[in-house]
């Protein structure tokens, strides 16, 4: 009985840690959408699709990530569970390209 409880508890904990997946597209040196939303306390995985003809470097000091996405490709960025807030990210190769992650 104890073993069955541990297995169920482990399965529930593993599911609780599955990341929230957010898709972000970079097109014409703009983020689409420019504002994303995710719940507090959950890990996040950004799937970033770069439709530009040049590379983009998606970066965020607040979210602690930096990743180059080559032209015409996609990549993923993983973010730890967050507290509520509004977090900025940007394209370091094109500084006018700005976006936000809102965590209510």
PLM regions: where:
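N-terminal post-signal-peptidase region of extra-cytosolic proteins
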Residues: 27-34, 60-64, 72-77
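Extracellular/periplasmic metallocenter environments
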Residues: 18-23, 69-104
